[in-house]
Structures are given as structure tokens and as C-alpha cells.
């Protein structure tokens, strides 16, 4: 580091600390699994340097406590977890952005995995460069698949573990202009009754510098889902989709309309996928949008006491076709109490019958 810090450097550091969730900033002061994501205030796209300092939330007006009665505010993973088993004849799937497996393993990863006992485990942002041995019991999960970032080591990455072996596996996003760069972002498993897609959608980045790239992804994602739908099987699309679809999906919508994950472009892109492929957000379909449904989020920044204050974003989803939602979805929930091994909490889907 240079001995003298320029005003531009200082401004950029402030922006980085206050921006909602910049997934790919190199920050040597943070341990693997930490994040520069922060629920703060609005930022504008950076077109020229130096970056402008975002407006601060007026002192005294920021959130103090969760808006949901009974919301969990623990900042470490509970040492003992008792989670419901899947009903007889049902399959349980869990999806979790672990924000760095090496860190998550030290903070309760296996406590959650053991307690949930899901039939399928979908992980995102594992940040490792090769498969980790004994992460799960291979006798329980005989099928495993790992996807790694093409050009950046220790970045992104997806993995899936399943108690039943799928018929086929398609790594990456075949409809993307550069499919090779997507293998650390998505995998599609074909089962007898459905296609399961485990996905870590790229976000638009600090200052929305990658918003156009994100829009390319959304178009390619829609095309891939349409191709799968044409094959006549159900669709289950899950993962960190890096979008808050509606204002109810984050604590401070009015101050984040220019923040990655809540721009009108990203929300419209997600709406287009749901509408044109005829899919539904299972959690919102189940919970509704009334006051009683507010305050349920899947991501809380490690910074600024966001977890304790209930300042969160709902970025993690299970999306299905409408027929599956109507006839087979039993439960779609956020495991709010399972926080501490990541800045995200797991989301869970239970469906009737086999995959």
C-alpha cells in the first residue's frame, strides 16, 4: 500500500464500506466468507473517477430492531438445531449461499447440514478451487457436483449434493454468449420428473458497473428455462438469484433503488423470466405480500449490526413452474435461525413425490 492515501482512494474505500453488497471486492482485511455487502444507502453508477460518497441515512432514522415479531437476531450459528423432517413421501431441498466454505466450516456449516438432513443440498459462493473431501457423507449423498469460476480463483462457485443420482448434468449456462465463464455459476440436473437448477446469479457490482452484463445473463437464463420447459418436465430453479423482486423483499427499499439487486432493470429482468416462462416465486406465493409477511430476509450484512437490527434482503429463492407449485409444493421457508456460518441463511423447499 502506498504511504500516502489519495482523496480518490479514501472516497472509494468509503463507498465500498457503505455499498449494499459488492460481491467481488478484494479486501485483505476480511476473512474468507466475510463480505463488503452492507445495507446502507443509495449509490449512483460510477461513470468517472473519483467516486462520490453516497448520501448517509439521517442520524436517528435508521432501523433499530427487526420489524417482524419474533425474528431471530443471533449472530452465530446455534450449537444445537432441531429442524423438521420432510413428511412421508416428500423430498426436501435446501439452498444456501455459504459465502466461503473454508470460513463457513469453522462457524457451524456442518451443524446446519446435519440438522436439515435435506435430500438435495445446493450451495453457492463456495470460493474454493477444488472439491472438499468429507464435506458431506458420501454414503448419504452419493452424487456430488462442483462448479468453479473459470478465471478467478477463490471466487463464486456452486456445488450440489443429492441422495439420488440425476439422469443428466449440464454445467454452465448453454444459452449465454460465453458459456465457459458460467460454469462456476450454475448447474442443471435432470431428474425423472423435473429439472433442478442450482444457481449463483452475478450481481451488478459496485456502482452498477456490471449491470449490462447482468442483463445479458437474465436474457440467457430466460432462454435456457424456456428450452427446459419445452421438454415437458417441471422446473425448480434455486440459489442466490441476487435480486429483491419487490419492495417487501428488503428492509429499506426507498433508499436502495440504485443499489445492485434492487434496480428497476434487475427487477424487470426477473419479472420477465417469471412471466414468460410461467414460473412463480414459491416463498412469496406461499407467504403473500401483506404486513404479516414483511421482514423475512435471507441475507444480512456482517457490517453495521444489520442482523441485530433486522436490516436484510431476500436474495435467495426457490422458483418453480405454476403446476408444481399448485400440486406438489408443501412448504417454502427461510431458515431464519440458521445464521452465523454465512451472511446468508438457507432457504428450503419441500415437495410431494420424487424428483
Regions found by a protein language model. Name each.
Residues 173-178, 201-218, 254-259:
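Surface-exposed cleft-lining segments at the edges of enzyme active sites
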Residues 153-169, 306-327:
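Conserved beta strand-loop-helix elements of the APE1-like EEP
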Amino acid at each position: 500500500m502506498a504511504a500516502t492515501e489519495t482523496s480518490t482512494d479514501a472516497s472509494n474505500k468509503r463507498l465500498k464500506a457503505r455499498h449494499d453488497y459488492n460481491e467481488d471486492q478484494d479486501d485483505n482485511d476480511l476473512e474468507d466468507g466475510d463480505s463488503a455487502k452492507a445495507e446502507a444507502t443509495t449509490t449512483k453508477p460510477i461513470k468517472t473517477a473519483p467516486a462520490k460518497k453516497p448520501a448517509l441515512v439521517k442520524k436517528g432514522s435508521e432501523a433499530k430492531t427487526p420489524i417482524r415479531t419474533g425474528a431471530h437476531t443471533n449472530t452465530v450459528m446455534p450449537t444445537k438445531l432441531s429442524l423438521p423432517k420432510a413428511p412421508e413421501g416428500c423430498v426436501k431441498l435446501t439452498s444456501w449461499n455459504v459465502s466461503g466454505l473454508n470460513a463457513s466450516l469453522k462457524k457451524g456449516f456442518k451443524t446446519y447440514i446435519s440438522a436439515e438432513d435435506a435430500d438435495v443440498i445446493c450451495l453457492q459462493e463456495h470460493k474454493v478451487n477444488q472439491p472438499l473431501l468429507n464435506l458431506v457423507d458420501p454414503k448419504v449423498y452419493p452424487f456430488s457436483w462442483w462448479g468453479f469460476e473459470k478465471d478467478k480463483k477463490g471466487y463464486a462457485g456452486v456445488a450440489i449434493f443429492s441422495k439420488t443420482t440425476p439422469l443428466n448434468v449440464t454445467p454452465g449456462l448453454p444459452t449465454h454468449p460465453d458459456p465457459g465463464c458460467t460454469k462456476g455459476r450454475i448447474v442443471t440436473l435432470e431428474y425423472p420428473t423435473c429439472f433442478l437448477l442450482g444457481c449463483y446469479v452475478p450481481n451488478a457490482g459496485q456502482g452498477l458497473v456490471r449491470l449490462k452484463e447482468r442483463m445479458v445473463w437474465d436474457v440467457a437464463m430466460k432462454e435456457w428455462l424456456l428450452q427446459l420447459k419445452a421438454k415437458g418436465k417441471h422446473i425448480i430453479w434455486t440459489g442466490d438469484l441476487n435480486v429483491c423482486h419487490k419492495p417487501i423483499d428488503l428492509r429499506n427499499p426507498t433508499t436502495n433503488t440504485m443499489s445492485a439487486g434492487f434496480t428497476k432493470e434487475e427487477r424487470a429482468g426477473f419479472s420477465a423470466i417469471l412471466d414468460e416462462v410461467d414460473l412463480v416465486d414459491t416463498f412469496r406465493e406461499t407467504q403473500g405480500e401483506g404486513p404479516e409477511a414483511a421482514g423475512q430476509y435471507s441475507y444480512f450484512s456482517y457490517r453495521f449490526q444489520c442482523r441485530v437490527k433486522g436490516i436484510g434482503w431476500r436474495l435467495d429463492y426457490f422458483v418453480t413452474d405454476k403446476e408444481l407449485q399448485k400440486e406438489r409444493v408443501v412448504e417454502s421457508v427461510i431458515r431464519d435461525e440458521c445464521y452465523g456460518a454465512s451472511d446468508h441463511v438457507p432457504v428450503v423447499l419441500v415437495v410431494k413425490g420424487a424428483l
